[in-house]
């Protein structure tokens, strides 16, 4: 009578961190197909039925993120140390190795001793989150909630003191001052407002009150009305016989329109010439030597007033 083949002993896979039944005859892990396995002592073998406990992977026995591609969690250089540093020794992920549901009272000292011998024999691995067996009912005090994990991540990214060893500055991937960015829905409006406030007090100084009062007042003629001349400030057409103020550049304005402007800026709103005849306009960069056609056209449009002023004199 042929004898039954001996049952393989219980082994521990250091890659999967679970107990397995090795694949014979190569003695490799049936899950990861690696040979980094260790035979367990015989005193923990189930002697009631003489067979090794079932090691078929179930949903509760599977390691967290077992089938997730590890490249999905690839972090920039330096961030991996920060991410794993958050999950320190106080963070423990509850897992259930094979047989934990049926034998929760297994001696924890033997398991710690086995892990210690394994690390001593094969060399210490890089620090990582500890995986310890916990009961299915109730939450361990050291296990944080999902909200706590997210809060730790947010605090670590925002707080400069939480990422001292990244070498990326207190704001991580932001390689400049965070105030240089437009944050939120009104961020762009805030930047435009700041720019306008910076240019509010720029430009030529106010004109002298004596020069403003000395500006001549001329009547609007039929030639002005026929040419469609209008006030450059309020854009209203001049009425026949209306009194307007004439600047040295021959541009005509309503008295109520040009006086408040000259009290703040000593320049013509059209050609940017001051009351002394000096041009206060500045050409944009790269346009040096290029004249403004609007000034010449505006001057030409006001030529009838000049002729009229000459004839009246």
Swiss-Prot record:
- What highest taxon heads this organism's lineage? Eukaryota
* Residue span of region Required for interaction with BAG6: 5-100
Zinc fingers, RING-type, are found at: 231-272
Task: Describe the reaction catalysed, as an equation.
Answer: S-ubiquitinyl-[E2 ubiquitin-conjugating enzyme]-L-cysteine + [acceptor protein]-L-lysine = [E2 ubiquitin-conjugating enzyme]-L-cysteine + N(6)-ubiquitinyl-[acceptor protein]-L-lysine
Query: What happens to this protein after translation, modification-wise?
Result: Ubiquitinated. May undergo autoubiquitination.
Free-text domain note: The C4-type zinc finger is required for interaction with BAG6.
Task performed by this protein: E3 ubiquitin-protein ligase that mediates ubiquitination oF target proteins. Depending on the associated E2 ligase, mediates 'Lys-27'-, 'Lys-29'-, 'Lys-48'- and/or 'Lys-63'-linked polyubiquitination of substrates. Part of a BAG6-dependent quality control process ensuring that proteins of the secretory pathway that are mislocalized to the cytosol are degraded by the proteasome. Probably acts by providing the ubiquitin ligase activity associated with the BAG6 complex and be responsible for ubiquitination of the hydrophobic mislocalized proteins and their targeting to the proteasome.
Q: What is this protein called?
A: E3 ubiquitin-protein ligase RNF126
> Native species of this protein?
Mus musculus
């Amino acid at each position: 009578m042929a004898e039954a083949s001996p049952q393989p002993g219980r082994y521990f896979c250091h890659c999967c961190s679970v107990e397995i039944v090795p694949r014979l005859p190569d003695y490799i892990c049936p899950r990861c197909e690696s040979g980094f396995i260790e035979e367990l002592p015989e005193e923990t073998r189930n002697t009631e039925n003489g067979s090794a406990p079932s090691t078929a992977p179930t949903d509760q026995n599977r390691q967290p993120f077992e089938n997730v591609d590890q490249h999905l969690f690839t972090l920039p250089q330096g961030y991996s140390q920060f991410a794993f540093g958050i999950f320190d020794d106080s963070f423990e992920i509850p897992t259930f190795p094979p047989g934990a549901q049926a034998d929760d009272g297994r001696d924890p000292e033997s398991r710690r001793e086995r892990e210690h011998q394994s690390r001593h024999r094969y060399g210490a691995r890089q620090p990582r989150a500890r995986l310890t067996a916990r009961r299915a009912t109730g939450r361990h005090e050291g296990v944080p909630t999902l909200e706590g994990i997210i809060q730790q991540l947010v605090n670590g990214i925002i707080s400069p003191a939480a990422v001292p060893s990244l070498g990326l500055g207190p704001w991580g991937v932001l390689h400049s001052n965070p105030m240089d960015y437009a944050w939120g829905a009104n961020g762009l409006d805030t930047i435009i407002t700041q720019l306008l406030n910076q240019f509010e007090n720029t430009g030529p100084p106010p004109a002298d009150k004596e020069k403003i009062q000395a500006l001549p007042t001329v009547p609007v003629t039929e030639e002005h009305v026929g040419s469609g001349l209008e006030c450059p400030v309020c854009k209203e057409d001049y009425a026949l016989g209306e009194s307007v103020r004439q600047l040295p550049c021959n541009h005509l304005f309503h008295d109520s329109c040009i006086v408040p402007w000259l009290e703040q800026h000593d320049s013509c709103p059209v050609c940017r010439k001051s009351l002394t005849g000096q041009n206060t306009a500045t050409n944009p960069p790269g346009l040096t030597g290029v004249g403004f056609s609007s000034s010449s056209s505006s001057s030409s449009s006001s030529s009838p007033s000049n002729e009229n002023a000459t004839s009246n004199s």
